[in-house]
Swiss-Prot record:
Cytoplasmic side: 1-378
Official protein name in the record: Cyclic AMP-responsive element-binding protein 3-like protein 2
Main location: endoplasmic reticulum
Function: Transcription factor involved in unfolded protein response (UPR). In the absence of endoplasmic reticulum (ER) stress, inserted into ER membranes, with N-terminal DNA-binding and transcription activation domains oriented toward the cytosolic face of the membrane. In response to ER stress, transported to the Golgi, where it is cleaved in a site-specific manner by resident proteases S1P/MBTPS1 and S2P/MBTPS2. The released N-terminal cytosolic domain is translocated to the nucleus to effect transcription of specific target genes.
GO molecular function: cAMP response element binding; DNA-binding transcription activator activity, RNA polymerase II-specific; DNA-binding transcription factor activity, RNA polymerase II-specific; RNA polymerase II cis-regulatory region sequence-specific DNA binding; transcription cis-regulatory region binding
Disordered as annotated region, ranges: 196-264
Subcellular localization: Endoplasmic reticulum membrane
Record's compositionally biased regions (Low complexity): 208-220
Lumenal side: 400-521
Keyword Transferase: no
Length: 521
């Protein structure tokens, strides 16, 4: 036990030194020319504790000359606790930089070789990944630790290879590590000469190598991280970049607590699930195969439960967000509908106002057109009336018988002289029966008095004839003793009086009376 404890301390110290050597800042490390298969065999011989003794180490060079075939993987390791080897090989680059200043002295290398060559119990090398559990049959890959110390091993093992003899019978006892064929091809075809700082990124892990209970939250290109004291017994796997609810869940026991030996403390969820499934609750490490199988089963169930809860939570959040969006869209739709209704009402009122305005404009235009038409008609009627009045005044002087008026007007002057000069006619007219009163009232007088009386009596009779004689009977006053000239004039005047009673009735009466008076004298 003392040897075991001292070996564990050296391993811890060795891992600490390796974590210092694997700092990403030290890029000027040495490149190794050792093949990847040899490094892998060294790790399987030293770390897993399957070596027998030092003579086997001396014959290691003979066995490492044979390169494993990528297409024919080696058989699995058959150990008592094979569950500790149930991890997939990590797709990590085997090339790691080691600073030239951080070299080991011969004593440290010899002590480390002694602990590595010592056969440890299987419980001390039990390893399990921090974030995943893989199906059995695949050995863990801790190539980071191996490549970090590959140079001291080569320096120390070179004299051993020269001094030891080749025993081919020991090759059957060399444990082999099973790798995926494509991964082996990838690493074996990767030449150390082509290695550089930019090519240190690890290839993505194939999805076929994951088990059903794997988390699948690892980054496709994991980076190399330095070791810490808390991760001494776990392989150097890169931690996932994204947050994982399963790895940090309080319902599951941390993977590093399931390693090593000692009391085993499980979570309440794991205990409850084990009891519900009818499995016994393990209390100490290391676990047996049945206990490990049962624990893996219930851990898988718990992970599925956690993932289902997470998916339901995300679905609920998504549905809540969708409901909120639907509600906001519905409210917005209602508001838009109200706005559309308001706009429709406004448009309807504007159309009504436009129709009213159009009717008013059309009415005003029709009225103005009517007024203009009436004004034009009125002007035309006035012009026509003016022309009618003008032409009527021109033709009014001539009348229907213009010759009678022409003959009557100039005949007044020559007829007045014989009436005044001829006394015989006037005497003959005065002797007329009907005018006897005139003869009685008349008396012999001088010619001057007769003329004055003649003018005064003619005026009086003219005025009395206008008032007392509304109708004149010309044939009653015409005497057969008158001359033919007087008869023709009277006939024409009588016809003219009949035709124009309204216009020249008064003037004709005055002329007839004057002529009658003159004729009587």
């Amino acid at each position: 036990m003392e040897v075991l404890e001292s070996g564990e301390q050296s391993v811890l110290q060795w891992d600490r030194k390796l974590s210092e050597l694997s700092e990403p800042g030290e890029t000027e490390a040495l490149m190794y020319h050792t093949h990847f298969s040899e490094l892998l065999d060294e790790f399987s011989q030293n770390v897993l504790g399957q070596l027998l003794n030092d003579p086997f180490l001396s014959e290691k060079s003979v066995s490492m000359e044979v390169e494993p075939s990528p297409t024919s993987p080696a058989p699995l390791i058959q150990a008592e606790h094979s569950y500790s080897l149930s991890e997939e090989p990590r797709a990590q680059s085997p090339f790691t930089h080691v600073a030239a200043s951080d070299g080991f002295n011969d004593e440290e290398v010899e002590s480390e070789k002694w602990y590595l060559s010592t056969e440890f119990p299987s419980a001390t090398i039990k390893t399990e990944p921090i974030t995943e559990e893989q199906p059995p049959g695949l050995v863990p890959s801790v190539t980071l630790t191996i490549t970090a110390i590959s140079t001291p091993f080569e320096k120390e093992e070179s004299p051993l290879d020269m001094s030891a003899g080749g025993d081919s019978s020991c090759q059957t006892l060399i444990p082999k590590i099973k790798l995926e064929p494509h991964e082996v091809d990838q690493f074996l075809n990767f030449s150390p000469k082509e290695a550089s700082v930019d090519q240190l990124h690890l290839p993505p892990t194939p999805p076929s190598s994951h088990s059903s209970d794997s988390e699948g939250s690892l980054s496709p290109n994991p980076r190399l991280h330095p070791f810490s004291l808390s991760q001494a017994h776990s392989p150097g796997r890169a931690m996932p970049r994204g947050p994982s609810a399963l790895s940090t869940s309080p319902l599951l026991t941390a993977p590093h607590k399931l390693q090593g030996s000692g009391p085993l403390v499980l979570t309440e969820e794991e205990k409850r699930t084990l009891i519900a499934e009818g499995y016994p609750i393990p209390t100490k490490l290391p676990l047996t195969k049945s206990e490990e199988k049962a624990l893996k089963k219930i851990r898988r169930k718990i992970k599925n439960k956690i993932s289902a809860q997470e998916s339901r939570r995300k679905k609920k959040e998504y549905m809540d967000s969708l409901e909120k969006k639907v509600e906001s869209c519905s409210t917005e739709n209602l508001e838009l509908r109200k706005k559309v209704e308001v706009l429709e009402n406004t448009n309807r009122t504007l159309l009504q106002q436009l129709q009213k305005l159009q009717t008013l404009v059309m009415g005003k235009v029709s009225r103005t057109c009517k007024l203009a038409g009436t004004q034009t008609g009125t002007c035309l009627m006035v012009v026509v009336l003016c022309f009618a009045v003008a032409f009527g005044s021109l033709f009014q002087g001539y009348g229907l018988y213009p010759s009678a008026t022409k003959m009557a007007l100039p005949s007044q002057h020559p007829l007045s002289e014989p009436y005044t000069a001829s006394v015989v006619r006037s005497r003959n007219l005065l002797i007329y029966e009907e005018h006897s009163s005139l003869e009685e009232s008349s008396s012999p007088a001088s010619a001057g008095e007769l003329g004055g009386w003649d003018r005064g009596s003619s005026l009086l009779r003219a005025s009395s004839g206008l008032e007392a004689l509304p109708e004149v009977d010309l044939p009653h006053f015409i005497i057969s003793k008158e001359t033919s000239l007087e008869k023709s004039v009277l006939l024409e005047l009588q016809q003219h009086l009949v035709s124009s009673k309204l216009e020249g009735n008064e003037t004709l009466k005055v002329v007839e009376l004057e002529r009658r008076v003159n004729a009587t004298f």
